């Protein structure tokens, strides 16, 4: 809490310009694996938590990085649809790979989904990921107008 113009205010006022924070949840993507939301909407921005290659019924996808990446994209699409957004509205993508040897194969799937619209992206090799998966992807998007 702090004083502003001699009126006691609570912390949410510090979120200048952000008037609404809304958690997003859909049964068309796997449930959160810990204490977090599948996504959060802040005004017209959608922040999608890292999606891993699990099906909506919470089963791990077996197979190639391509197959796993397709499931991750489907999860992201479903969460964005629930948020009034889509892949075409993505501003930034963060990709985490447990083995950078999978980069080319992952990138071929990525390119299929982003052929004309190319959001900013980072791809990072990491030592490990939750539930021992080899791929995780998080995105920031805007809502459709």
Curated annotation (Swiss-Prot):
Stored Gene3D superfamilies = RutC-like
Q: Which GO terms describe its molecular function?
A: deaminase activity
Recorded hits in InterPro entries, A to Z, give: RidA, RidA_CS, RutC-like_sf, YjgF/YER057c/UK114
TM stretches of this protein: none
Q: Name one Pfam family in it.
A: Ribonuc_L-PSP
Protein name per Swiss-Prot or TrEMBL: Protein MMF1, mitochondrial
Transit peptide segment: 1-17
* One cellular component term from this protein's GO annotations in UniProt: cytosol
The record's subcellular locations are: Mitochondrion matrix
Q: What does this protein do?
A: Plays a role in the maintenance of mitochondrial DNA.
UniProt family annotation:
Belongs to the RutC family.
Main location per UniProt?
mitochondrion
**Any idea which UniProt keywords this protein has?**
Mitochondrion, Transit peptide
Lineage, top-rank taxon, reads Eukaryota
Any one GO BP annotation for this protein: mitochondrial translation
The record, for PROSITE patterns, names: UPF0076
The reply on keyword RNA-binding is no
As a miscellaneous remark, the entry gives:
Present with 168000 molecules/cell in log phase SD medium.
* Keyword check for Cell wall biogenesis/degradation: no
């Amino acid at each position: 809490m702090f004083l502003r113009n001699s009126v006691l205010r609570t912390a949410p006022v510090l979120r200048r310009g952000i008037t609404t924070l809304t958690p997003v949840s859909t049964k068309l993507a796997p449930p959160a694996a810990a204490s977090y939301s599948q996504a959060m909407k802040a005004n017209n921005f959608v922040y999608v938590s890292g999606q891993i290659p699990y099906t909506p019924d919470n089963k791990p996808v077996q197979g190639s990085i391509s197959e796993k990446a397709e499931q991750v994209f489907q999860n992201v699409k479903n969460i964005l649809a629930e948020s009034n957004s889509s892949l075409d509205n993505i501003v930034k993508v963060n990709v985490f790979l447990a083995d950078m040897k999978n980069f080319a194969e992952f990138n071929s799937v990525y390119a299929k989904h982003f052929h004309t619209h190319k959001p900013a992206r980072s791809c990072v090799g990491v030592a490990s990921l939750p539930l021992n998966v080899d791929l995780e992807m998080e995105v920031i998007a805007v809502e459709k107008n």
